[in-house]
Every structure is written in structure tokens, then in C-alpha cells.
């Protein structure tokens, strides 16, 4: 049973520390995840939620106020 706990902890840490894939779909479009209330200018730079976390949306870099 201890082995299962150790295995689970190891797998959890392995996925938690995986580098470079956070919000990959948004970054491929040239954007970053911003708070949902942010206005993206021009509107074509607002990609919506995509793979951003809850209450955030993907906007093109350097857009909005």
C-alpha cells in the first residue's frame, strides 16, 4: 500500500513540474491568459477562453487596456 502512495505522489509531481506546456493553445496563437474582464483591442485579438484557467481569456500579446 505504501508503494501505491509513493507512486501516486511521484506521478503527481512529475505532471505538476512538466515544463513549457502551460496554456499551449493560447501561446501558439501569440497570446497570453488575462482576466476575463480585460478588453482585447482590436476585437480580432480576443481568442476567448481556449485553454486558459477559469475566469480568464486568451488575448494577443500587447493588446487591451
UniProtKB/Swiss-Prot annotation:
Q: In which tissues is it expressed?
A: Expressed by the venom gland.
Q: Where is the signal peptide?
A: 1-22
Q: List the disulfide bonds.
A: 26-58, 33-52, 40-59
UniProt xrefs under InterPro entries: Myo_ane_neurotoxin_sf, Myotoxin
The places in or outside the cell where this protein is found are: Secreted
PROSITE patterns attached here? MYOTOXINS_1, MYOTOXINS_2
Instruction: Write out the entry's keywords from A to Z.
Output: Antimicrobial, Disulfide bond, Ion channel impairing toxin, Myotoxin, Neurotoxin, Potassium channel impairing toxin, Secreted, Signal, Toxin, Voltage-gated potassium channel impairing toxin
GO CC term (a single one): extracellular region
Function per UniProt: Cationic peptide that possesses multiple functions. It acts as a cell-penetrating peptide (CPP), and as a potent voltage-gated potassium channel (Kv) inhibitor. It exhibits antimicrobial activities, hind limb paralysis, and severe muscle necrosis by a non-enzymatic mechanism.
Name the family the entry cites.
Answer: Belongs to the crotamine-myotoxin family.
Q: How does it assemble?
A: Monomer.
Stated name of the protein: Myotoxin-3
Amino acid at each position: 500500500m505504501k508503494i501505491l502512495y509513493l507512486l501516486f505522489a511521484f506521478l503527481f509531481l512529475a505532471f505538476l513540474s512538466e515544463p513549457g506546456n502551460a496554456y499551449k493553445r493560447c501561446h501558439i496563437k501569440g497570446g497570453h491568459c488575462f482576466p476575463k474582464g480585460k478588453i482585447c483591442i482590436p476585437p480580432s485579438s480576443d481568442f476567448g477562453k481556449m485553454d486558459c484557467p477559469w475566469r480568464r481569456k486568451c488575448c494577443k500579446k500587447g493588446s487591451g487596456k
